Amino acid sequence: MTDAEQREAARQFANKWKGRGREDEDGRSYWIDFLSNVLGMANVTDRVEFEKKVVVDGNTKRIDVYIPETHVLIEQKSLGKALDQKIMNSGSVELTPYDQAKRYNDNLPYNEKARWIITSNFSDIWIYDMNARVPEAVKISLGEIPGKYPLLDILIKKDVQKIFHEMEVSIKAGDIVGLLYEAFLK
């Protein structure tokens, strides 16, 4: 897929999911759509684990989305849920979506630990680099995905080390290609 095709797929994805998003009903479709149609991942359902079981304090919990080959753990919330506020979870513990994901990650076997944690509420995607001493969210809104989708290459590429420096050039190049593509369409 060319950059222009990916950008267009990202635009269509953003338009399709604007104003939609129920955690239980739409979470799986959202990520399958993004991984396959925007990032071009083949055989998504064979390569991604949905509702992966993890035992926390003796209770079985479920990780919404886990991508084993890139060690990405995704905690999905419904549209409108704030990603920076504590929410009462099924264990009657108030945690932010990141804290909930980190708790799951802390209870995974060492070889399955997340390299990246993502929290999402359908309108926002926050990425945390678990190699950072103090992980801070890189925030992408749904409307920004057409210009910033390369930041989400962490979902499919094992070799991404940081998402700021190496992606900045790619995003700028993508912006230029996108402008050229749009100019040719006129």
Predicted stretch roles:
Residues 1-18, 56-59, 63, 70-72, ...:
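Short, basic/polar, glycine-containing "phosphate-handling" surface segments that engage DNA
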Residues 34, 39, 67, 72-74:
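Central hydrophobic cores of alpha-helical transmembrane segments in multi-pass inner-membrane proteins
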Residues 49-56:
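Short, solvent-exposed loop/turn elements at beta->coil junctions and helix N-caps
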Residues 14-49:
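Acidic-basic catalytic patches of nuclease active cores, encompassing PD-(D/E)XK
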